């Protein structure tokens, strides 16, 4: 059975891991880094992902960042002269992770466990699954990020019973989950969060401050300059990271724009105290979900044994202090906040494949599910923090006499009125026999699978007619669209492989030309003109093919040159070996001729 890789598909950075034996291992990317920027660039028909894409973000307008924040929406991004769905961009990141995982493992990878924020709704989960499919991956399981982190933390502690709070502040999302660990069971008791809070928001506070200060000083608004804005974003991210280790950092952006008098530079010092002041409201927003999760789990702070920090943004000192103040506990630092989620996903892959025994994961649905009923009321069928998979049915009736059909409006959220919650989908149950209002019996059943993806069934108990849908929001992709995108992704992969092969061939040609020219020069006047002429002729032919750019011709001429150059090299080595042998023979003969010289007779006297 092929390996099931674990993928943390992050807003800012992503990571991929695999189970080796019983231990999860992070796979480094081609640049040797253990996390990969979730950045995609398009340049000259080429798709660039990761570190290389991030490096050119300042100068390349066709660069897409933080696509995860758009997952589950109908919003598209424009790049490379066309529009892409969030699923397509995410698929390019997944395809890149899959590619270097395959290189590391030396085998094809077709299956993955992908993590999502615990507070992702159904549309966002479905979009993530679709992205995996487009990338050529069978998504075996969608796992909540805090749950994956708990798996990685608790894998070697299965004999110990404890309750843990996972505080997960990533690049674009924030989750808090409370789990109970014991006897190999990872039971999620409650989860809460904010899908619009993350490291990007902390960066934005610094950007806004820099824009404001520069405008005060120079009267120019940098927020309208796209290239300047990207430089500000890079500087803000760097300053934020610096301030996790030092109390003050210098921001220097020469030639940020031009004024009437010439070029202008941005120079400022940002202290940690100022940064804390700018981001105080963001840190404050992390407190409510912590309290909500504890309340939903029916626990008090004294019941929590460990607090685990996950996500790069938990390195911000003010965030760490807020966690300490809110929980009264020193956070556990035994896990790497950037890597632990991917490692947990790899462990879940091992559970699915049977490589990890005696581990059971019980996750929950983060938001309540229900339908709209008379008066625009949201009637919940499944409460938030219900363990999944689960199923729940409830019987409803018609609101009017002789009503021939009922509209089922499926929603997700916590507000009492339907209009204030997230619409997951709508469908209709028709051909209801004429009857007074309140008489027909319509049974509505909600099913949530292990990935947190919802399907809904409505059944007329009188006629036994039923209608079932797997929820597809207005951002969902049809099977045909996914199929087309999969083909596009495969074509891109083939084009990338072809481009790589072309570069390798051109490098081989350059190397062969250099080596052969060197050999021809070294063999000048050494007496094997036939082989030299043949190599020179093959060399000239290869140079012509190189100029024409015909790859097939280059390949054929390269093979021909290698053959002739090898024959010439053999002659050269044979000559060198013969000369060495002759020299060794001459030295041996000389030693024999001189063997009688300088011999002195001596007497030996025994005492």
From Swiss-Prot:
Compositionally biased region (Acidic residues): 595-607
PANTHER family hit by this protein: HEAT SHOCK PROTEIN 70KDA
Alphabetized SUPFAM superfamilies for the sequence: Actin-like ATPase domain, Heat shock protein 70kD (HSP70), C-terminal subdomain, Heat shock protein 70kD (HSP70), peptide-binding domain
Biased amino acid composition, Low complexity: 579-591
Keyword terms: ATP-binding, Chaperone, Nucleotide-binding, Phosphoprotein, Stress response
Record-given protein name: Chaperone protein DnaK
Role noted for this protein: Acts as a chaperone.
Induction: By stress conditions e.g. heat shock.
Residues where Phosphothreonine is found: 173
């Amino acid at each position: 059975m092929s390996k099931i890789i674990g993928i943390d598909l992050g807003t800012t950075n992503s990571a991929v891991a695999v189970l080796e034996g019983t231990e999860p291992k992070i796979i480094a990317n081609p640049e040797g880094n253990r996390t990969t920027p979730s950045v995609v660039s398009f340049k000259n028909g080429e798709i660039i992902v990761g570190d290389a894409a991030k490096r050119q973000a300042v100068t390349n307008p066709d660069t897409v960042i933080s696509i995860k924040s758009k997952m589950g929406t109908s919003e598209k991004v424009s790049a490379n002269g066309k529009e892409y769905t969030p699923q397509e961009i995410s698929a390019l990141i997944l395809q890149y992770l899959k590619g270097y995982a395959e290189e590391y493992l030396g085998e094809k990878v077709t299956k993955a466990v992908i993590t999502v924020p615990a507070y992702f709704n159904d549309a966002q989960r479905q979009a993530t699954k679709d992205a995996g499919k487009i990338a050529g991956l069978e998504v075996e399981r969608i796992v909540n990020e805090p749950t994956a982190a708990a798996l990685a933390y608790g894998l070697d502690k299965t004999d110990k019973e404890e309750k843990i709070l996972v505080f997960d502040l990533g690049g674009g999302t924030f989750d808090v989950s409370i789990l109970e660990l014991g006897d190999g069971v990872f039971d999620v008791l409650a989860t809460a969060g904010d899908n619009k809070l993350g490291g990007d928001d902390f960066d934005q506070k610094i950007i806004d401050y820099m824009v404001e200060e520069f405008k005060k000083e120079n009267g120019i608004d940098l927020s309208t300059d796209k290239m300047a804005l990207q430089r500000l974003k890079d500087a803000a991210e760097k300053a934020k990271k610096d301030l996790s280790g030092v109390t003050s950092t210098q921001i220097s952006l020469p030639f940020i724009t031009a004024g009437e008098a010439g070029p202008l530079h941005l120079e400022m010092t940002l202290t940690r105290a100022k940064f804390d002041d700018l981001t105080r409201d963001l840190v404050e927003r992390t407190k409510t979900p912590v309290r909500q999760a504890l309340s939903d789990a029916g626990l008090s702070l004294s019941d929590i044994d460990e607090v685990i920090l996950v996500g790069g943004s938990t390195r911000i000192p003010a965030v760490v202090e807020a966690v300490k103040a809110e929980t009264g506990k020193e956070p556990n630092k035994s896990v790497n906040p950037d890597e632990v989620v991917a490692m947990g996903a790899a462990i879940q892959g091992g559970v699915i494949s049977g490589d990890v025994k005696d581990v059971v994961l019980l996750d929950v649905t983060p938001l309540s599910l229900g339908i709209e009923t008379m008066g625009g009321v949201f009637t919940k069928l499944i409460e938030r923090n219900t363990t999944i998979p689960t199923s729940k049915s409830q019987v409803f009736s018609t609101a009017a006499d002789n009503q021939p059909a009922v509209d089922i409006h499926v929603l997700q959220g916590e507000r009492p009125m339907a209009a204030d919650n997230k619409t997951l989908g709508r469908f209709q149950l028709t051909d209801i026999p004429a009857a007074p209002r309140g008489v027909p019996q319509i049974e509505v059943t909600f099913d949530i699978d292990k990935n947190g993806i919802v399907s809904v069934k409505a059944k007329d108990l009188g006629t036994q007619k039923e209608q079932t849908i797997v929820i597809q929001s207005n951002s969902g992709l049809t099977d045909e669209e996914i199929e087309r995108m999969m083909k596009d992704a495969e074509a891109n992969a083939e084009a990338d492989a072809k481009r790589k092969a072309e570069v390798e061939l051109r490098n081989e040609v350059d190397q062969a030309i250099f080596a052969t020219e060197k050999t021809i020069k070294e063999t000048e006047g050494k007496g094997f003109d036939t082989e030299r002429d043949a190599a020179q002729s093959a060399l000239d032919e290869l140079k012509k093919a190189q100029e024409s750019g015909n790859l097939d011709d280059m390949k054929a001429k390269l093979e021909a040159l290698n053959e002739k150059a090898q024959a010439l090299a053999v002659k050269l080595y044979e000559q060198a070996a013969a000369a060495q042998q002759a020299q060794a023979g001459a030295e041996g003969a000389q030693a024999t001729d001189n063997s009688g010289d300088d011999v002195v007779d001596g007497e030996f006297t025994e005492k």
